[in-house]
């Protein structure tokens, strides 16, 4: 399967669309009027369910304009290939003012990413590297 399959759960739902030929993501829209409370979060309905192409998963990502102009971010959103429920976007308002979303507003973007799911092998040792166990800024800031 090479197509992104979309099922409209609500007649007024908007089909995900790319904003330009080179756009990485498909804009997804709200099917409801909601308020993202100041410094709060809410799961916003899109009125669609999807089936991603084989070998991929969907990632719900912020729209740069909403993030830059209004401080609206998107929290965790991984859409597994076997998930068939409604696609929702968890929006987080980083500002001190409520943000109003109207039905039909583009709220996030769906990015399809290839995924590798190798078998897990338990080993007694891992090979050494120059970095070793250094993390959290160990290679510089």
Swiss-Prot record:
Pfam families: dUTPase. It catalyses: dUTP + H2O = dUMP + diphosphate + H(+). SUPFAM superfamilies: dUTPase-like. GO terms for biological process: dUMP biosynthetic process; dUTP catabolic process. Its EC number is 3.6.1.23. GO terms for molecular function: dUTP diphosphatase activity; magnesium ion binding. InterPro entries: dUTPase, dUTPase-like, dUTPase-like_sf, dUTPase_trimeric. It comes from the Viruses. Gene3D superfamilies: 2.70.40.10. Its cofactor is Mg(2+). Pathway: Pyrimidine metabolism; dUMP biosynthesis; dUMP from dCTP (dUTP route): step 2/2. Keywords: Hydrolase, Magnesium, Metal-binding, Nucleotide metabolism. Belongs to the dUTPase family. This enzyme is involved in nucleotide metabolism: it produces dUMP, the immediate precursor of thymidine nucleotides and it decreases the intracellular concentration of dUTP so that uracil cannot be incorporated into DNA. This is Deoxyuridine 5'-triphosphate nucleotidohydrolase. It comes from Paramecium bursaria Chlorella virus 1 (PBCV-1).
């Amino acid at each position: 399967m090479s197509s992104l399959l979309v099922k409209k759960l609500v007649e007024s739902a908007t089909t995900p669309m790319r904003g330009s030929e080179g756009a990485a993501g498909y804009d997804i829209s709200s099917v409801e009027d909601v308020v993202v409370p100041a410094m709060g979060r809410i799961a916003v309905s899109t009125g669609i369910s999807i089936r991603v192409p084989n070998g991929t998963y969907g990632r719900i990502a912020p729209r740069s304009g909403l993030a830059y102009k209004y401080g609206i971010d998107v929290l965790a959103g991984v859409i597994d290939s076997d998930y068939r429920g409604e696609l929702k976007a968890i929006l987080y308002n980083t500002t001190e003012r409520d943000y109003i979303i109207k039905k039909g507003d583009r709220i996030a973007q769906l990015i399809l990413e290839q995924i590798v799911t190798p078998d897990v092998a338990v080993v007694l040792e891992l090979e050494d590297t120059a970095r070793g166990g250094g993390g959290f800024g160990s290679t510089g800031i």
